Amino acid sequence: MTISVEVFDSRRNQLGEGPTATGDKNSHVQWCDIYGQLIRSKNLITGEINEYKTDEPVGFQVPRKNGGDILGTANGPVLRDKDGTLHKMPSREDADGFKDKNVLRWNDAKVSPDGNLFLGSMAYENQTNEGALYRLSSDGKALTRLFGDVAISNGMDWSNDLTKMFYIDTFAMSVDVFDYDAGKLSNRRKLVEISDGMGYPDGMCSDSQDNLWVAFWMGSCVRGFDGKTGKQIAEIKLPVQKVTSCCFAGEKLDQLIITTAVGNPGEPMDLTEYPEAGFIYVAQPGVVGKKTNLFGA
């Protein structure tokens, strides 16, 4: 079965990432443009668009229960109120006990169903394994380093019964699964092996049946995988190379929002071959997804 896609938002993003869907009927779709230093949004129902600038590159945006966002700015994370006021939060240095050896930034992040924020880091020179995965407590006061030796910390999500966490370190070329218990991770193993030619696994979300929907950088698609067996079950092709992440949206959570990118700074930008690079897309893969979890602090 061919799953068609259409453009949802044609504002071009240098590096669109981390979409979420909140509000009435899960219609407030929001994402970040990491190197454009922008948080952008569009309403699925009304079509209303908004955006605001950040002072630094912003690796993720996570909506809060009381309004505003948690932003993965280069020196953050920071808590942003609805009026734009910023509040400092625990930093990597607080969690690690030492400063970054090289220049790192935050990348993907997601709130677990039990309220913790999991957030990962990566080096700008992303071939090095200097990144790590962290957990921020639901009150926003304690940042804990869970493990290091990460190249590009990327997509994550949880099983319905909250006993498993799925995780992507892009250059590991796999989708891994952990046993999950109240914010603690153990027993890491590979669920999906990514073959040469498929592209690089990037952001990810899961549906109500615990199937995984993985965006592929340099792969021009989102692929669906069975969350129990790792078998590929679907592919959504896009007219761009660099597909970055996805989330479910809409009243029935049956619309898949897909972010894409022009590329990283310094990379050649060929908009002749891929004129829609950096656009946001929407598809209906025929499944029901999960709601975006909000952060409590």
Predicted ranges, named:
Residues N43-G47, D81-T85, S137-K141, D179-K184, ...:
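Short loop/turn segments that connect beta-strands within beta-propeller blades
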Residues S4-S10, G47-K53, L86-K99, K141-G148, ...:
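A short beta-strand motif characteristic of beta-propeller blades
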Residues S174, E193-K231:
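Loop/turn-rich, solvent-exposed surfaces of beta-rich toroidal or solenoidal domains
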